[in-house]
Amino acid sequence: VLEPAWRPAGRSLAGRWPAGWRGPHRQPGPAGSTRPVGAGTEARRGLAAWPLEVFAVDDTSVQLTWRASPPAGLRLEIGDIVTEPLASSKASLLLSLYGRVWAPNSEVYGELATRGPRSGTAPATGARRSAGAHSCLTFLAGPRVLDRRWPAGPGTAVVEGLSPGTTYDIVASAEGVPRFLAGRVTTLLPPPGALLCKLAALSDVHVGEKHFGVLGRLWDSLGLGPGYEPYPVRALRGAFLEAAEWGAQLYVVKGDLTRLATAAELRDAGALLASAPRPVEAVLGNHDNVLGVDMRSLLASYGVNVGWWPWARDVPGARLIFANTAGGDLRHNVGRLPPALGRRIAELAGEVATPALVFLHHPPELRPFPTVYPPGLPHSESMALLEALSAANPSTLISCGHRHRNRRYGYGPLVIAETSSTKDYPGAWAGYKIYEGGVLQTVRRTGRPDVLAWTEATRRAMNGQWGRWSPGRLGDRCFSITWGST
């Protein structure tokens, strides 16, 4: 949990930071103590417009995000890892996702849009020690403007090489600002046993979508220019690349591959999935279900096989189960899981001695009437599935999409996780580490510059409420499960 040491002046705290304020600006002193910063006014003035957030955490790393360009000369210290200064809004260079240097011009953005950021390693330095082979910093700093309609400056930083189950102070300093305690984060404890497999789940791709919003429409002018890809395509390519860098051995796309399931959109989605750097499993969502279009044949021509009947894939440490909940009619947002399909999912989960991860598009509905829009599976079908799974294999995690948000809840021994879309705020993908004794989920934002600029803009949807509702809490996004302890 991040515990900020300062309040953005004149800003509401609701939905921005977790509880746990630490009072006025403080600076680390002797071991086990803190002392007030002498230049508290200057620190507040320089950093009030730069809210830092811990978006993701796992057992060995943390992802930090920010909405505005960092102040000049900003350094972050986490444990004994010290970053190079993060680029300010006036920097003449754009640092790509993994530290390569790009000039901020249209040619660069075109290359990033078509091929994605190149990989490399940005060194971490510091007075106490330099980062070793297993401790490195990867960071991203945006240019002043990506899309002229939106203020630029959002960024992400991933700090690796941390110790599991350890609380770290996040210490910041900048030009003219002394070192002070900016926050605190605790890494997760991994499940017992060895790490066996890593996979990534992505949801609600919506290939073919050109605008976002319900109460008002947000348009992506960058994606409409020559040589640029639309934001759903950029977002999925960026997520694929970053998940592969993270170590994912398999991608699972949890439905809504397209916007309207036209033949052209299905072909574009199939080609996009076929170009992924790792194998792909996919299920269909309500946006993929259109009468008169043979979606399965179209996707199969690109090597993407989806079936109406549930199927399984065994990986080290777990059985992965996939089922389509798109239903057999054209009612928008409606999910269906007939009893026969629910029983088949439970049979697949109970056939093996390993735990199971079930991937659906629509989440189970735990109440008789939907309390959240869009609705998930019908309540009766949800209860039948959950009861059957609880009896067949209590060590089961159900991962869903559809609602474009991050939430975690349970039913008996089962854990249910909803994860957000790749293409709207927060613009993220979910990583799953499968251990001998459990599974660890972490949801990270995609940091590719032309993706981050768009997803930051979409947080303004629904009169600004989307940015508060969609990301969920840190505990909804990142958690560790030990089988038999839930």
Each PLM stretch: what is its role?
Residues 49-50, 56, 63, 70, ...:
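N-terminal active-site segment of His-dependent metallophosphoesterases
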Residues 63-65, 72, 84, 239-250, ...:
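His/acidic metal-ligating clusters that form di-metal
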Residues 90-102, 203-234, 290-305, 328-337, ...:
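Acidic/histidine-rich helix-loop elements
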Residues 159-166:
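Surface-exposed, short loops/turns at beta-strand junctions within beta-sandwich domains
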Residues 173-174, 184-191, 267-347, 384-385, ...:
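Extended active-site neighborhood of metal-dependent phosphoesterases/phosphodiesterases
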Residues 189-200, 208-214, 312-322, 351-356, ...:
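Beta-strand-turn-beta hairpins that frame and shape the catalytic cleft
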Residues 208-211, 259-264, 286-293, 328-332, ...:
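Active-site environment of divalent metal-dependent phosphoester hydrolases
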Residues 436-486:
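A short C-terminal boundary segment appended to hydrolase-like catalytic domains
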